[in-house]
Amino acid sequence: MWVAKWLTGLLYHLSLFITRSWEVDFHPRQEALVRTLTSYEVVIPERVNEFGEVFPQSHHFSRQKRSSEALEPMPFRTHYRFTAYGQLFQLNLTADASFLAAGYTEVHLGTPERGAWESDAGPSDLRHCFYRGQVNSQEDYKAVVSLCGGLTGTFKGQNGEYFLEPIMKADGNEYEDGHNKPHLIYRQDLNNSFLQTLKYCSVSESQIKETSLPFHTYSNMNEDLNVMKERVLGHTSKNVPLKDERRHSRKKRLISYPRYIEIMVTADAKVVSAHGSNLQNYILTLMSIVATIYKDPSIGNLIHIVVVKLVMIHREEEGPVINFDGATTLKNFCSWQQTQNDLDDVHPSHHDTAVLITREDICSSKEKCNMLGLSYLGTICDPLQSCFINEEKGLISAFTIAHELGHTLGVQHDDNPRCKEMKVTKYHVMAPALSFHMSPWSWSNCSRKYVTEFLDTGYGECLLDKPDEEIYNLPSELPGSRYDGNKQCELAFGPGSQMCPHINICMHLWCTSTEKLHKGCFTQHVPPADGTDCGPGMHCRHGLCVNKETETRPVNGEWGPWEPYSSCSRTCGGGIESATRRCNRPEPRNGGNYCVGRRMKFRSCNTDSCPKGTQDFREKQCSDFNGKHLDISGIPSNVRWLPRYSGIGTKDRCKLYCQVAGTNYFYLLKDMVEDGTPCGTETHDICVQGQCMAAGCDHVLNSSAKIDKCGVCGGDNSSCKTITGVFNSSHYGYNVVVKIPAGATNVDIRQYSYSGQPDDSYLALSDAEGNFLFNGNFLLSTSKKEINVQGTRTVIEYSGSNNAVERINSTNRQEKEILIEVLCVGNLYNPDVHYSFNIPLEERSDMFTWDPYGPWEGCTKMCQGLQRRNITCIHKSDHSVVSDKECDHLPLPSFVTQSCNTDCELRWHVIGKSECSSQCGQGYRTLDIHCMKYSIHEGQTVQVDDHYCGDQLKPPTQELCHGNCVFTRWHYSEWSQCSRSCGGGERSRESYCMNNFGHRLADNECQELSRVTRENCNEFSCPSWAASEWSECLVTCGKGTKQRQVWCQLNVDHLSDGFCNSSTKPESLSPCELHTCASWQVGPWGPCTTTCGHGYQMRDVKCVNELASAVLEDTECHEASRPSDRQSCVLTPCSFISKLETALLPTVLIKKMAQWRHGSWTPCSVSCGRGTQARYVSCRDALDRIADESYCAHLPRPAEIWDCFTPCGEWQAGDWSPCSASCGHGKTTRQVLCMNYHQPIDENYCDPEVRPLMEQECSLAACPPAHSHFPSSPVQPSYYLSTNLPLTQKLEDNENQVVHPSVRGNQWRTGPWGSCSSSCSGGLQHRAVVCQDENGQSASYCDAASKPPELQQCGPGPCPQWNYGNWGECSQTCGGGIKSRLVICQFPNGQILEDHNCEIVNKPPSVIQCHMHACPADVSWHQEPWTSCSASCGKGRKYREVFCIDQFQRKLEDTNCSQVQKPPTHKACRSVRCPSWKANSWNECSVTCGSGVQQRDVYCRLKGVGQVVEEMCDQSTRPCSQRRCWSQDCVQHKGMERGRLNCSTSCERKDSHQRMECTDNQIRQVNEIVYNSSTISLTSKNCRNPPCNYIVVTADSSQCANNCGFSYRQRITYCTEIPSTKKHKLHRLRPIVYQECPVVPSSQVYQCINSCLHLATWKVGKWSKCSVTCGIGIMKRQVKCITKHGLSSDLCLNHLKPGAQKKCYANDCKSFTTCKEIQVKNHIRKDGDYYLNIKGRIIKIYCADMYLENPKEYLTLVQGEENFSEVYGFRLKNPYQCPFNGSRREDCECDNGHLAAGYTVFSKIRIDLTSMQIKTTDLLFSKTIFGNAVPFATAGDCYSAFRCPQGQFSINLSGTGMKISSTAKWLTQGSYTSVSIRRSEDGTRFFGKCGGYCGKCLPHMTTGLPIQVI
């Protein structure tokens, strides 16, 4: 371990050394950047695969060049890793160039400098450069980089934002691409002085408009802007076709649409010069970051950033005028960008907005240049002002571009007051300035709301047009899928070259040679292209063969369910209820799109009209700002705001514009009126979420109800009649035209001028009281205006006097009578006035009346309240209730009231009292006072909420009390002996009650005190049986046994079995059963080959699986036990047949008796590798003669040639031994073996030409001369072997070899070696050796001397062995003790293993008994009881006597018990606390000068009790309570005459005084009390003063101000005069001296109790409810300073103020930890997703079987398709090979016969929340694609015995909040099993490959598959 730490430290310091070596080679531009940084590092990124593994050094990756022709295709995904700031960063990147338009163009203005740009080169296609992704697999940590010319971009880490860029050389050139290219990385934390001066932007749209146009001309400003737009659009519309009208069709609001911001980027000359040829890559990297920020789901909308044009200005005069003034530069750029834009939306070069990136400082003034950007607010669709500028500051500029672009979308800063209302506590993209704690990748909730409102209110219509051509996306198709391996070889080595088989495909691309003279395979040390197939369902990715389904894909957002409707926005007049849904099922991830569709829905509510006299809803919203001048210059503090209707644009009708009463100035006070506010006075449409929506006169959304001409909603025009008339006579002055009554509607008055020209007749309007509303007092209103009739909601429009047709009109119902007049002056032409209006029918108006006897309303109070009847409008005929509108013209009657709830009373009641605060002496206690409802008739009292008693004065909540100074407590005896010696027992003791004076009391006197008389003891563990894990089944098939070791242990020590209960000893053997063994099956014997004499007969012998009834390969059965398939047979002797008779045999009979005969196989044609075997085959007749093969044609011909395979060996060398000499020259040696599958074989199987050296020379330091007189003796070399080269005896591999026959052609035949009996050295292998003749029949005679061995040793290396240390000390010197030692399992090289790797039965004991002899005379220590404590209070000691006794209880000398440890004879004890003296602070000196006395209070105090009698303290230690003091020297004083005063203005005095002042020797005025007043002569005169009233005011003395506890205070009385005049107010009372007061003052003494009493005290209210329903929240209460009379005061001391808020914890949301709890506590029986508290974190769990008694918990797998298990079905026909280098191929020599094959995919997995394990065998939420179901995290195959696993499993718990524990282990089962498991760094992903012949892996049965919360 320490070596690893040392190496880590060394590598760290080496990395620092390498980093520092780059620091001096900066380009001037980067050097200037570095100077502004507080920290930076230089790193060298490494390209890695997705598991973080570095690619081989031989594989050189050439980073992409910034050119249109790529040297190599860039991968769709890539990974880089580097270490900086003490952290490891891995960037997982995916190609993304979607922010570039398909028609993206680059424009150069001015002539580029020679050498920096290629004049003839077209625009570079840099789409292959840009990538985005995540850091360390964390979704919240984003990364955006360009890979061209290095890594340039930014990413977010745990500690903030980081920026990365390749380092440029000082001469401006780049470092060569390759592995050693240095990069500069720095954090956002620029140095403080630099950072504090930077702001995103300090000039907003409102400020710019404020300086250019005053607010009161807001409407004119809009009109001017509209005129300018019409001019621009009108000028261009002549040449622009209108074929794209669909693009500007108005979309439905409050629906999420995709938006496309087409942007033009302009770089000024300084930026172009600074970045040179890297400019395009740099600018587009910035825009790639911007596009990623606008893709973040926190913005709440789907917004695409599309770069359509990049303009590069090489000469300043070619671009806009740029100077230090930011506002001017912005204005110039906005004008210039219009010339670069094509207003046709379908044109590829059209842009919605434009950005200027400049290196010029952006200043708001000459002295203030701290802005990073500037833009207009909300002008994204304004072609004149949709533009912004940004100062280039490196990669950080991407965030400022995103920020300024947000302003054009109407988003304000995160510190905006509106954002504060939304409780935005953290800054995001729209932070007001750069800060250390901002999060620039995401958007605040406030910004999200701004963007959504901006788009929903129609200001982003221009962003709806999607580019006609598809946005360019990098192809996701991998290159290897287009060019297979053979095609790649042809491209690399020429036509005809193909991929080499049997080699790891994905590591390197190996290809065959095209030159016949040089056969073999070649590679360029690069892997094949990503996407090259490497097996079924697999392909190559970054040098690895991975599953095609493991790719991370973007996740598009989907809408969640609708939330409940909100409360109604209005109580009457038509309110709105809204419901929303969120894009969170799921949320968009990995760059997925935001949801598209409706996000809000609405419905009308409370549609009844408001009662008469109710304030207008918009007027009410304006009045909320009354008295608020909003920091607007010129607005008074008592301002009154009125609603503004005229002069407001159509789009702005739902904003709250209010005007200052009495003026025409109006201002925008809120961006949005409340839902349900009418859009205007002339319409019934209402505002919803800032938009004007259609509504009817019935206040219902989308209603078609309209008001008829009579003013009735939904009426039929039958309830009124029209009055018309003409007035045309006049005289000078005002003439009455017509009187319009209340209730009239549709008033229309028109005055036609004389001869169509303006004349001298003017309409005027007045109310019933004669007050003119306009044109009164011969003053005319020439312009159009709207008049609100005071006290009504009636609005009357007037056209203005300067019109040929002067008009007054109003559609509303007139609530008051008005008078129409005409003013005639000048020429006195007759006026021509036409009027018309509607009035209700008289008979209809009498049909309705008010009914004051409607239903009773609710009682105003709980007790002793009032209630009134509701007044309703009814029809006189049938008394049916109708709308109140029908009675609006009638006066409202008085309400009918009555008393209610008279059967009860509300009272304050004391329901409880606390204990007295002082147990001894005076104190106070708290009263629990609550409001109680007392039932008069029933006599019952019920507690109600305190607010019901709010009109009654609440009694004080504290009262005085007195403690009895008696304290009680429990005293105890000693504990008894424990009932058990181990495993948890119990002991007890006696208790009795005593007081503080030592007197025993009855137990009930202490019953309120806690008493402990029993407690647990000896809770340590008893010896118990322990068992190791079960071994694997001792058979590979069929029934067998498994074993384990069982021992008795105490903690970790082993004891003899006698210490444990034998009856509970676990079993050490257990039966086990595996799959049915394959066995040999024989058929019946066939007929004898002859009809007489000797012959043989054959039978079928097959290897079968009886359970599956399947025939297997013979290799599946044990060769040595194979039954014979041939035996001899003897029939009756044959009669002699002569040659003549033979010749006469029928030919047919000869043919029928012919059969095939074959010999044995020859040795393999090669010594190792793949070869052939041969044997002879011939047709023999009945006489065993060679016959024509046609005679045997009726039988199948046996094969003559057969493929054979013998593994080849390879040389393996051990470690070199130490040099044979200690100095000078020597030799070193090592062992070299020919190995095959970790087994040494004969050296003939290895190539002797490449055999490694076994010996070499070594040189050390020269030997000293003093030691060179005698030659050193030769040293024998030692052989050092590495751990993977075991030293074994040389074995002869005679597998399948033939020994030459020694007896009549007979020969030994050998079978294959069986499996090794041990996994390490010391094992044995068996094989069958039989003697056969040349025909393959069993024979009895072979040369015994040449018989091959049937048995050989085997094992890949030395076995681990038990090793143990020395015994420790015995725990006892006699009477039986134990001693222990360390016993471990380890290899000879020292590597320590777990115990189960060694033979458990041979483990040496680690604990044994010792000193079993009896102790001498069986003596022991006797312990007397403890004495009482030596101190009555405080600390003391207890003592006891301990002496040695024998078995007869006789006392002995202590030396006889020396072998036994003596118990302690004393111990510390503590009684009650001792009282102590307490001294207060010294009082002031008794004199002001000279010598005096100081005093202080000293008393005896007991901590926790308070003051006690002084006899309880030690008098000798009492502090002094008095001491002498000395003030300044006394001085002489005298009186000085200051002249005579006039008569005093005070009362009661009847003379004036000559004022005398008391002064010292230096004539300094001093206090008069130090001077003798008898020496002052007074003269006076009589005065007449008014009479006086006097009061006596008492107040507390200051003695109690700082003294709390037991002390005294004196109530001081002083007199105050009150003059009789009424002008004086109470706060001007003046105190005068006592002698002047006719009231006798009283002086009283009171006792101060605990805390000082004040004139006012803090009063607290009730705690509010917790601010959250679950988790940690805040509770608040009111804390006020109140006098005893209940008045507010400021006399309370702040340091005594109680807290006004405190934390609270509501655990409702965390109270459920299992689905069972949810089922029981919430009575839920529905399966579904619920949130559970698992180990302190809220996790979403699927609860299944909720209708059953025991529900189950399942974890939903977000990446469902990446959770699968597979048992591979193919089996190699030759299992002793691994073709295609372990990759899967469908054309393998395989059969698909594995019975257990299957493939299962999981969507949910069951978890056990108690053990925190996954139930891998629960398949409820799984889908088996084919074959058998496979448990979770399990894989296997029956493919190969050559470490070539094909079975796979995958686990991906990303997004679930859980991960696999690091303690997870996998167990292997079967034969020849091998396992390879990869784990991600965060533990959420596992990928495993398992298999054998046959074999599988599964989670360990002991630990299961443990999981834990992330």
Swiss-Prot record:
Its cofactor is Zn(2+). It comes from the Eukaryota. InterPro entries: ADAMTS/ADAMTS-like, ADAMTS_ADAMTS-like, ADAMTS_CR_2, ADAMTS_CR_3, ADAMTS_spacer1, MetalloPept_cat_dom_sf, Pept_M12B_GON-ADAMTSs, Peptidase_M12B. Keywords: Cleavage on pair of basic residues, Disulfide bond, Extracellular matrix, Glycoprotein, Hydrolase, Metal-binding, Metalloprotease, Protease, Repeat, Secreted, Signal, Zinc, Zymogen. It is found in: Secreted, Extracellular space, Extracellular matrix. Residues 259-467 form the Peptidase M12B domain. Residues 724-846 are annotated as: Spacer. It holds the Pfam family Reprolysin. Residues 1711-1910 form the GON domain. Residues 468-555 form the Disintegrin domain. The keyword Metal-binding applies. Gene3D superfamilies: 2.60.120.830, 3.40.1620.60, Collagenase (Catalytic Domain) (3.40.390.10), Thrombospondin type-1 (TSP1) repeat (2.20.100.10). Residues 1-21 form the signal peptide. One of its GO terms (cellular component) is extracellular matrix. It is an enzyme of class 3 (hydrolase). Zn(2+) binds at residues 403, 407, 413. GO terms for molecular function: metalloendopeptidase activity; zinc ion binding. Very sparingly expressed, although is detected at low levels in testis, prostate, ovary, heart, placenta, lung and pancreas. Overexpressed in several brain, colon and breast carcinomas. The precursor is cleaved by a furin endopeptidase. Residues 22-253 form a propeptide. Disulfide bonds join 334-387, 363-369, 381-462, 419-446, 489-511, 500-521, 506-540, 534-545, 568-605, 572-610, 583-595. Binds 1 zinc ion per subunit. Residues 556-611, 846-904, 905-961, 966-1023, 1024-1073, 1076-1135, 1152-1206, 1207-1264, 1304-1356, 1358-1416, 1417-1475, 1476-1531, 1535-1588, 1589-1652, 1654-1710 form the TSP type-1 domain. Glycans are attached at residues 92, 191, 445, 702, 717, 728, 809, 870, 1061, 1456, 1542, 1572, 1763, 1781, 1852. May play a role in tissue-remodeling process occurring in both normal and pathological conditions. May have a protease-independent function in the transport from the endoplasmic reticulum to the Golgi apparatus of secretory cargos, mediated by the GON domain. This is A disintegrin and metalloproteinase with thrombospondin motifs 20. It comes from Homo sapiens (Human). The gene is ADAMTS20.
